[in-house]
């Protein structure tokens, strides 16, 4: 019962590990094996990983490993992680979040270079659904809210809801619907729990290759943002939005037009970051010591307001709220 990932080590170096409802990855290199909650800690040593399933017990001895589940030998797939180890370092920046903010022009471009077949399959799943439900937690829930607006503009019946709330009424989701599940890590517990009782097909938008969500989904689109070390999500958020916008725009026009439009957006992100460094310092100085900060937005700007408010709370512990522009006067 419960959620756990446990590693036991003997003096001889022999190890055993098992998991239930918590992520555990086995990194595989020549003569070396690694255990971690995700792949980032061992990226500098190997780009090969096995993602353990619930009930798996892995035993490591003399540079070899075996996996059992319910007493039976299991042969789990070895995944290739297409991340550069340098991406998991600060590369001269003061902190990871600064680095990841500045990576956004590149990560948005990577996010929109999806295989045509993957985009077409996602659109087909959406078109065949009676209702499309977008769901995530925290930052990913705001990406879901914004993505829902993009898909509504393309003419689809779409509802967005935070996963921990959707779990209370997911019995209304039928096999004729579609759930688009959004998560940077692919290990968000509330999201995975909600999906357990859903009969509808699942399209996942996720960053971490081989994660639990990616394995359980009927179809997955990776945002290709690389490792996000900063606790407060930045580049994963914009990459999630880029993929959702790519789907919606492709449905209305073509993949080529949608991709070119978003590549142009990536260029504008780069200009915005370069042109506003001094203003960022000025606003930061002004916010220091403030007790309350309110973010106001209309339309798609409301999702930006919600995410901005969350970022301020996460990083500064300053009280912050967000409101739609029309609601603020009430």
Feature locations, PLM:
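Glycine-rich, flexible loop/turn motifs
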Residues: 31, 45-48, 77-79, 92-93, ...
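Active-site phosphate/pyrophosphate-binding segments
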Residues: 104-108, 112-133, 219-330
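Conserved short alpha-helical segments that host acidic/polar catalytic motifs at enzyme active sites
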Residues: 1-90, 94, 103, 109-110, ...
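Generic beta-strand/beta-sheet core signal
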Residues: 9, 18, 27-29, 36, ...
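Glycine-rich phosphate-binding loops that contact phosphosugars or nucleotide phosphates
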Residues: 124-264, 298, 328
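Beta-sheet entry/capping signal
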Residues: 5, 14-15, 32, 57, ...
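A residue-level signal for conserved active-site and pocket-lining positions in enzyme catalytic cores
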Residues: 6, 21, 58, 101, ...
């Amino acid at each position: 019962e419960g959620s756990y990932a446990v590693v036991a080590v003997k003096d001889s170096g022999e190890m055993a590990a098992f998991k239930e409802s918590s992520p555990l990855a086995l990194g595989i290199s020549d003569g070396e094996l690694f255990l971690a909650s995700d792949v980032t800690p061992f990226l500098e040593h190997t780009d090969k990983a096995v993602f353990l399933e619930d009930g798996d017990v892995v035993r490591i001895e003399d540079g070899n490993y075996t996996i059992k589940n319910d007493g039976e030998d299991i042969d789990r797939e070895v995944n290739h992680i297409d991340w550069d180890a340098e991406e998991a370092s600060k590369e001269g920046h003061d902190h990871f979040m600064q680095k990841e903010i500045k990576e956004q022009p590149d990560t948005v471009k990577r996010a929109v270079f999806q295989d045509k077949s993957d985009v077409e399959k996602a659109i087909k799943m959406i078109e065949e659904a009676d209702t499309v439900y977008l769901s995530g937690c925290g930052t990913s829930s705001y990406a879901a809210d914004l993505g829902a607006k993009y898909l509504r503009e393309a003419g689809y019946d779409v509802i967005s809801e935070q996963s921990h709330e959707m779990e209370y009424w997911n019995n209304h989701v039928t096999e004729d619907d579609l759930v688009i599940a959004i998560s940077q890590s692919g290990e968000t517990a509330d999201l995975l729990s909600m999906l357990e009782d859903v009969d509808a097909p699942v399209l996942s938008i996720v960053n971490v290759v081989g994660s639990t969500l990616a394995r359980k989904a009927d179809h997955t689109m990776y945002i290709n943002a690389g490792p996000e070390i900063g606790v407060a999500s930045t580049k994963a958020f914009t990459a999630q939005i880029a993929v959702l916008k790519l789907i919606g725009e492709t449905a209305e026009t073509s993949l080529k037009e949608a991709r070119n439009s978003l590549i142009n957006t990536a260029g504008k992100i780069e200009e915005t970051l370069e042109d506003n460094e001094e203003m960022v310092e000025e606003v930061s100085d002004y916010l220091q010591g403030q007790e309350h900060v309110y973010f106001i937005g209309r339309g798609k700007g409301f999702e930006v307001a919600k995410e901005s408010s969350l970022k301020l709370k996460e990083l500064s512990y300053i009280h912050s709220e967000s409101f739609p522009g029309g609601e603020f006067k009430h």
